[in-house]
Amino acid sequence: MNNFKLCVPCLLGLEGPIADELRRMKMQNVQNENGRVYFTGGAKEIAKANINLRIGERVLLELGRFRAETFDELFEKTKALPWEMLIPRDAAFPVKGYSLNSKLFSVSDCQKIIKKAIVERLKSVYGIEWFAETAETYQIQFSIMKDVASLCIDTSGEGLHKRGYRPAHNAAPLKETMAAAMVSLSRYRGREDFCDPFCGSGTIPIEAALIAKNCAPGLKRDFSAMRWRSLDKSVWQLEREEAVSREFNGNYNIIGTDIDPTALDIARENAVRAGVSDIVRFEKADATKFDRVTENGIIVTNPPYGERIMEKQEAEQLYRLFGEAWRKTENWKLYLLSSHTEFERTFGKTADKKRKLYNGMIKCDLFMYLQ
C-alpha cells in the first residue's frame, strides 16, 4: 500500500482544526469538505493518523467515488473497484452506511447491492463461490450524498473518540474528540493555568493534559487495520515509538471542578487510566463561586444545557451566576459550549467570537471570551 485517498469524517465545524492536525503530521494533499477531511498516504500514514488524531472520528480508506442514480449503476461501479487489493479471500467484509438527498434512499437495499457487487468481484478474482468470512474484518462504509457514492474501508474499528481511558462515565458525557477540539480551539498548549469548572467525568481536563504533554491519544488502543494482512504491521509499533519520543514533560496547572463527588471520583479514575493523574487534579467546587486569581488562565467548559440534565430555567440561572463570578476575575479567557439560543443575554456578556459546532446531534456554539 503506497498511496491511497484517505478520509477523516468529523462533526460539522471541525474540518479546519482536523486539517491543521494533518498538516502538522506532514500529511500530503490535505483538503476539506463538509463533514470530512481528505489526505493521501499508505500504511505509515494510516497508522500515524489513527494513533495521533485528536479531533477526527475515524480514518477511512476511500476505494472509490462515483455518481449512482440507479441500483444497476451502484452495482456495476462498485464491482469495478479493486477490492482484492485489500480484502483476502477469507476476510469478513460487512457493509454499513447512509444515504442523504439521493435517488437511492433505501440504506438496506444499498447495503445488499454493494455487498453483492463486492462478492461478485472477489469471486471472479479468487475463483471461489463461497466466502467463509472467518478471518480479520474489513468494514465497508458507504455514503451516498446527492447521488454521489463514496465507498470506503474503515481502518480504525471503534471510533477515535474511544481513547481507552473512559469505560465509566456520568450522565450526558462529552465525546473525547469534541473535548479535544474545544481545547485546541482555545490555543491551550500547557503554558497557562487551565480550568474546567463543570468537569463532570473529567474529559476536558484530561484532553487538555494530553495536549499539554503532546501525548498521542491512540497509544492505549488497537485499530482494525492492525490486523490487515495487506498492511505492514511493523508501521504501528514504529509510529507508537515515534509518538512517545515526542512527548513533553513539564509543570502544568490543570484543574477540573464539579459539585458532584461521584463524578469527581470517576474523573480521577479516568485520569489514572489516561496516564495524566500526575498533572491533573480534581476538586469539589461550585462553579457559580469561581474565584481563581492568577496572572493568566484558560477556562474550557461544557456546562449543563437544560436539554438533557437540567431544566432550562435551572440552566439559565447557572449561566447567570457563573457569568457574574467569571466577570470578577481578571485574565481568564473563557471558551464555553452551549446550545442555548439566548446564552449571551443570560450570561450577561456578548462573546468576542462564536463558532458553530455539533455536540452529538445538538447544535451548539462555542462562545469565546478573550477579555
Where are these regions (language model features)?
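Short beta-strand/turn micro-motifs composed of small residues
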Residues: 10, 258, 338
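Non-catalytic nucleic-acid substrate-recognition regions in nucleic-acid-modifying enzymes
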Residues: 2-136
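C-terminal catalytic and target-recognition region of SAM-dependent MTase-like enzymes
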Residues: 285-371
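Class I S-adenosyl-L-methionine
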Residues: 98, 145-185
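A short, flexible beta-alpha/helix-coil linker loop
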Residues: 100-103, 159, 304-308
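Conserved S-adenosyl-L-methionine
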Residues: 174-291, 307-308, 313-314
